[in-house]
Amino acid sequence: MSITAQSVYRDTGNFFRNQFMTILLVSLLCAFITVVLGHVFSPSDAQLAQLNDGVPVSGSSGLFDLVQNMSPEQQQILLQASAASTFSELIGNAILAGGVILIIQLVSAGQRVSALRAIGASAPILPKLFILIFLTTLLVQIGIMLVVVPGIIMAILLALAPVMLVQDKMGIFASMRSSMRLTWANMRLVAPAVLSWLLAKTLLLLFASSFAALTPEIGAVLANTLSNLISAILLIYLFRLYMLIRQ
């Protein structure tokens, strides 16, 4: 059967509209979890204020030089802040991926679904999803640090891995390998969607500072919710595409 991107886009749009409130609640809940975890594990305001003490920002040619000019205590605070942000985002992304995919599965099975039920049903697979998303993020970030393009290619090739892990109950590395093979064979259908997702996330990041006009906490939740909705649309598209490819 010939698969066209247009038909998958249409199916994605219809599903997103029909389940919008449930997906919105999952996105909002994941955003709230991300912000709360980030706040809990981040250094205190007094510690963060120490990062500016005695660091010659104007004389630093880059981030590496800036870190080198910090004291050991400041470097530890920066590491803690970075780790807290990364950990909270990974947790939020894992819950989002599990929740959205379970929404699709439950709706496809003709069952009633709510945000809490979807997240609860995804609980058994969250540890594997967390590790998968961590490894995927790590590979993409390494690729972006090298020449940018390898990171984008990795993001495309590994896009189907979460769907395969949940839908087919694959292992972490098996889903990554299968995603690479299947995506490579269907690059014309996967690449435009992933590139659009990356572009949308980048644009949101550029305007994220404007959300802080409310309060930092509310702005962070709002920005994360919009980011989660963008990711949810991509997950719906990839799930629908994967099911069509398997037929």
Curated annotation (Swiss-Prot):
Keyword ATP-binding: no
Periplasmic side: 41-89, 141-151, 210-224
GO annotations of cellular component type: plasma membrane
The organism's place on the tree of life at top rank: Bacteria
Classification via InterPro entries: UPF0259
Membrane topology, record value: Multi-pass membrane protein
Transmembrane segments: 20-40, 90-110, 118-140, 152-172, 187-209, 225-245
Residues in the Cytoplasmic compartment per record: 1-19, 111-117, 173-186, 246-247
Subcellular location: Cell inner membrane
Keywords linked to the UniProt accession: Cell inner membrane, Cell membrane, Membrane, Transmembrane, Transmembrane helix
Family from the record: Belongs to the UPF0259 family.
The name this protein goes by in its record: UPF0259 membrane protein YciC
Gene: yciC
